[in-house]
Amino acid sequence: MLGWVITCHDDRAQEILDALEKKHGALLQCRAVNFWRGLSSNMLSRMMCDALHEADSGEGVIFLTDIAGAPPYRVASLLSHKHSRCEVISGVTLPLIEQMMACRETMTSSEFRERIVELGAPEVSSLWHQQQKNPPFVLKHNLYEY
């Protein structure tokens, strides 16, 4: 089963998790990380790293974030590069996350990414989709050769 780390501004992440658990019962491998004003990037990174390890069973983890480019999204992006089968999704809402509940058990992380972006477009995107639009910078020659 795919793990979920829901990370949003203020108390929104915990509110989403609480609403899901109220309706569906306790969710395994699902953690909420709230990003409050004044929280340092270092502390946010530590909290999200802990949540990643708690949610991961080896099948993959999906970071569900509220705003692309915001601190929770940026930290999730950095963490995803260090762990295989991690995806970063932005623009999520409670109804969309509810739609994806059953997919946690049947899809791979990349299949999940494609499906949630398809269902939530155009507001929902992923780190992978953003990277396809803006591929990383690659040097075509060695700068240090004389």
Swiss-Prot record:
The keyword Zinc does not apply. Signal peptide: none annotated. It comes from the Bacteria. GO terms for biological process: phosphoenolpyruvate-dependent sugar phosphotransferase system. GO terms for molecular function: kinase activity; protein-N(PI)-phosphohistidine-sugar phosphotransferase activity. Keywords: Cytoplasm, Kinase, Phosphotransferase system, Sugar transport, Transferase, Transport. Its main location: cytoplasm. Pfam families: EIIA-man. The active site is at H9 (tele-phosphohistidine intermediate). Coiled coil: none annotated. The EIIA domain is phosphorylated by phospho-HPr on a histidyl residue. Then, it transfers the phosphoryl group to the EIIB domain. The phosphoenolpyruvate-dependent sugar phosphotransferase system (sugar PTS), a major carbohydrate active -transport system, catalyzes the phosphorylation of incoming sugar substrates concomitantly with their translocation across the cell membrane. This is Putative phosphotransferase enzyme IIA component YadI.
